[in-house]
């Protein structure tokens, strides 16, 4: 970013949790703030942006959830004899977490007064200041103070994280629980949007991190509707193939959330390709490849008329600080102590979180195979495995995994150990940083056997430490790295293994331990330069973002369509007497499906339409690209009080009428044979494609074809059709995974023009021209028009044109909202390019909105984004008031207890 004048570029850095933990003291009423563990690379990037070097150009604001707030517990003694004995016997270490949770049940620390919240916020900001000149009030906590604090992690950790790591955890009885966790996830993202709204200034860059905040980019687009708003998203975890991602029930909402960003980064190109594939298959988006500033491939995805550039940029580590922290006198003493404890033995080191994707079980099995295959190494090698407890501790799956690990450790030690020696030393705990760095220094080999992860910082840190010349002949000691780790695409000269093949891993261990010193050094000289630094990652991120933002400002209209104001819509609906509803069908009243014949109306849709149609003030028209037979079968036969228009306006059937009127009856239809033969040729070339032959229009569908192949042949087909259709006065229209040919003179807009400019409630005669001399009191005073694709833009354009005419002719007749009750509303993303005045996100929200009008849905259920208080309740709701009262009572009770 170029610093304009003396104003520094503001960056709002949104993290899932602040790099601090807030704890209530054990013996008094003081609040303690301690550094949080994990996400070391991300927090290093935050520190780097706060450094004097970067703070001259950037003003960083760190915004994040406080995390679970609990009571302070005494630190566990790590690496003591008690824990070592239990670990070596394969037993589980002490679980202080359980006792802590029991205490929290008795005394909830979450009832904070406003003064306490202000005080803790000031303490957090003091911790966030690295230089008073450059950082003033730059830490912004997101308060979500509710009992069962882990609820805010529920959807992210129990649904998203497993899916991103290729773990299917869905069960038949998880629906209601998952819905509740989804609502919490939405609230979590909305709380961030609210907090950002308090500090956002025009021109800010908003940098969003990882899967806790997938909805935030689009929420911010809708909230600010600022064309200069710049949003970047970085996904730190793996992104799975579409085969896995598509199992998520909320998959489209998640992708739509990310479409609000200007640019999205992933840890490697494979993850980026998976994301692009998911968008193409689930959002009907298009993509094109280009080269970024480094000459690497990037993708530009277009969906709903909005664009996002997708790139890969592996995160790095702070190499300078790591080496400074590692090579100290204190750690040198610990290194000597470890070497003395394992004199004459090769030391293999591993540190992994104990969960189902880090490969601890696979590593132990491979080590067991190694000892079996190479007896000469028995009593000569020790594996020190540190397994960090998972944040999701206590689940049945993790308990079984822990038991499995303990059984393997016991089995290996019994079979290959002795009274004086155990080949595996397993520590199930969080070890202090100095102990971890000591292990990196002393290791002869590090083994990373993860079955799925993003960037493994342990691997990067190990290689960096081994790049430093030391006194213990450890320079260049090798790294064995799983091919399923995202880091394998960075450290390409490491010993890459398949962790599921224990024999191959065993052979790699033997080879690594047998390397000569010269071979180790040659390997290190190749692999060390491949380690990315957090400084370079941060700089490259910001400079690349600058390029794409400049390009976006020059080439892309990023105006956001506001959400439909449903409370105002309901109020206007209740006061109006001549109401007209104009609905598209596919993608509006029903979701888009692979087979068009399968898009039948739901029972809920039929029920809502019946209730709307039963009101004599309402007139409802379905204006669809479907043919007459489909509309008759699924709508006309059930609801004769609906007006129907088929094939984008070629046919219509009035309310309570049986006969269809053909508006193209006098049009030359000889073109169909020639167009049909061309479509048949492309159908043969494209497996999964088919032709829908309507009475007037012909449509070539490729939704069931491979997306890349379908897009290619759709482009080729359009070129062929454009050549001949100009001679017949035909339109060649690109729809959602289809190409349609129909006469130019009929479209949905023409139908809408005749329906609106008409005596409300009277029989239609569309063969005659519209009656412009009608008084406005005879025409609709409430018109809701809903559609999702570009053919519906004709309807929106007509309504906008009608409103412009009415403003001139009937300027004294405007209603209390300053208009004429016309609501052109698109269905889709807020970033979609449209002439509509408002948007609803999907058919589900359409039904909720119509349900609101007929009393099936409450205003609260339909209202969309809401404001939350600090405990996650809707502001000013009954639950919010009760919570505030309980907080006051609790604070008073606590003060009295301390006085006593």
From Swiss-Prot:
It catalyses: alpha,alpha-trehalose 6-phosphate + H2O = alpha,alpha-trehalose + phosphate. Its cofactor is Mg(2+). Its EC number is 3.1.3.12. It is an enzyme of class 3 (hydrolase). InterPro entries: Glyco_trans_20 (IPR001830), HAD-like_sf (IPR036412), HAD-SF_hydro_IIB (IPR006379), HAD_sf (IPR023214), Trehalose_PPase (IPR003337). In the C-terminal section; belongs to the trehalose phosphatase family. The gene is TPS2. It holds the Pfam family Trehalose_PPase. Residues 82-108 have a biased composition (Basic and acidic residues). This is Trehalose-phosphatase.
């Amino acid at each position: 970013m170029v610093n304009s004048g003396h104003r520094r570029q503001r960056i709002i850095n949104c993290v899932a949790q602040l790099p601090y933990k807030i704890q209530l003291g054990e013996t008094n009423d003081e609040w303690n703030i301690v550094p949080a563990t994990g996400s070391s690379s991300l927090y290093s990037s935050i520190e780097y942006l706060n450094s004097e070097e970067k703070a001259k150009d950037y003003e960083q604001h760190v915004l994040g959830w406080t995390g679970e707030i609990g009571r302070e517990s005494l630190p566990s003694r790590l690496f003591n004899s008690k824990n070592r004995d239990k670990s070596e016997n394969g037993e589980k270490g002490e679980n202080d977490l359980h006792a802590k949770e029991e205490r929290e049940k008795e005394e909830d620390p979450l009832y904070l007064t406003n003064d306490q919240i202000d005080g803790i916020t000031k303490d957090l900001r003091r911790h966030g200041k690295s230089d008073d000149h450059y950082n003033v009030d730059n830490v912004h906590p997101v308060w979500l103070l509710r009992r069962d604090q882990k609820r805010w992690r529920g959807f992210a950790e129990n649904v998203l994280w497993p899916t991103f790591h290729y773990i299917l955890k869905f069960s038949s009885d998880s629906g209601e629980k998952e819905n509740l966790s989804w609502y919490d996830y939405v609230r979590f993202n909305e709380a961030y949007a609210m907090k950002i709204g308090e500090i956002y200034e025009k021109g800010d860059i908003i940098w969003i991190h990882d899967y806790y905040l997938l909805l935030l980019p689009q929420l911010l687009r809708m909230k600010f509707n600022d064309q200069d708003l710049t949003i970047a998203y970085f996904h730190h975890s793996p992104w799975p193939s579409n085969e896995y991602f598509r199992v998520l029930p909320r998959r489209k909402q998640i992708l739509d959330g990310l479409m609000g960003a200007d640019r999205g980064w992933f840890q490697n190109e494979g993850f980026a390709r998976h994301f692009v594939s998911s968008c193409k298959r689930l959002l009907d988006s298009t993509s094109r490849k280009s080269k970024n500033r480094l000459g690497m491939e990037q993708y530009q995805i277009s969906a709903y008329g909005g664009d996002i550039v997708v790139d890969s940029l592996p995160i790095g580590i702070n190499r300078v600080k790591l080496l400074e922290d590692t090579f100290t006198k204190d750690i040198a003493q610990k290194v000597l102590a470890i070497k003395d404890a394992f004199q004459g033995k090769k030391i293999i080191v591993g540190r992994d979180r104990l969960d189902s994707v880090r490969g601890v079980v696979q590593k132990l099995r491979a080590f067991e195979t190694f000892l079996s295959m190479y007896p000469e190494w028995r009593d000569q090698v020790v594996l020190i495995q540190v397994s960090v407890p998972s944040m999701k501790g206590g689940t049945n799956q993790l308990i079984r995994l822990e038991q499995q690990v303990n059984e393997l450790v016991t089995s290996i030690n019994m079979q290959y150990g002795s009274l004086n020696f155990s080949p595996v030393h397993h520590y199930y705990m969080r070890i202090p940083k100095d102990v971890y760095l000591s292990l990196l220094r002393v290791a002869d080999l590090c083994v990373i056997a993860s079955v799925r992860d993003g960037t493994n910082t342990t691997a990067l840190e190990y290689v960096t430490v081994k790049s430093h010349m030391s006194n213990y002949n450890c320079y260049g000691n090798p790294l064995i790295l799983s091919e399923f780790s995202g880091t394998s695409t960075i450290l390409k000269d490491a010993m890459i293994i398949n962790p599921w093949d224990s024999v191959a891993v065993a052979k790699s261990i033997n080879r690594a331990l047998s390397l000569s010193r010269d071979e180790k050094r040659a390997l290190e000289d190749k692999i060390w330069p491949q380690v990315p630094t957090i400084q370079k990652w941060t700089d490259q991120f910001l400079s690349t973002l600058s390029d794409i933002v400049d390009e976006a400002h020059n080439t892309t209209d990023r105006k956001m369509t506001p959400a439909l104001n449903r409370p105002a819509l309901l109020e206007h609906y209740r006061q109006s007497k001549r109401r007209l509803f104009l609905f598209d069908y596919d993608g509006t009243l029903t979701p888009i499906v692979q087979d068009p014949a399968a898009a039948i109306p739901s029972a809920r849709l039929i029920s809502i339409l019946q209730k709307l149609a039963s009101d004599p003030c309402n007139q409802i028209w379905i204006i669809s690209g479907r043919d007459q037979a489909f509309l008759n079968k699924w709508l006309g036969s059930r609801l004769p009080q609906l007006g129907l228009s088929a094939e984008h306006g070629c046919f219509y059937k009035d309310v309570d009428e049986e006969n269809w009127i053909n508006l193209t009856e006098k049009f030359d239809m000889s073109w169909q044979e020639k167009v049909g033969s061309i479509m048949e040729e492309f159908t043969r070339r494209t497996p999964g494609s088919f032709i829908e032959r309507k009475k007037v229009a012909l449509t070539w569908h490729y939704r069931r074809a491979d997306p890349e192949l379908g897009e290619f042949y759709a482009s080729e087909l359009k070129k062929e059709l454009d050549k001949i259709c100009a001679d017949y006065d035909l339109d060649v229209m690109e729809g959602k995974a289809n190409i349609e040919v129909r006469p130019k003179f009929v479209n949905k807009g023409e139908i809408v023009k005749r329906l609106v400019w008409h005596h409300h409630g009277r029989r239609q005669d569309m063969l005659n021209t519209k009656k412009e001399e009608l008084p406005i009191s005879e025409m609709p005073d409430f018109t809701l028009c809903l559609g999702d694709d570009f053919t519906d833009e004709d309807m929106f354009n007509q309504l906008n044109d009608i409103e412009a005419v009415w403003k001139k002719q009937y300027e004294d007749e405007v209603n209390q909202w300053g208009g004429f009750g016309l609501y052109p509303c698109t269905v889709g993303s807020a970033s979609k390019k449209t002439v509509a005045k408002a948007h609803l996100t999907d058919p589900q929200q359409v039904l909720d909105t119509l349900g609101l009008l007929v009393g099936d849905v409450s205003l609260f259920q339909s209202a969309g984004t809401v404001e939350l208080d600090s405990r996650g309740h809707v502001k000013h709701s009954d639950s919010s008031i009760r919570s505030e009262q309980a907080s006051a009572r609790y604070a008073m009770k606590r003060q009295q207890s301390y006085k006593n």
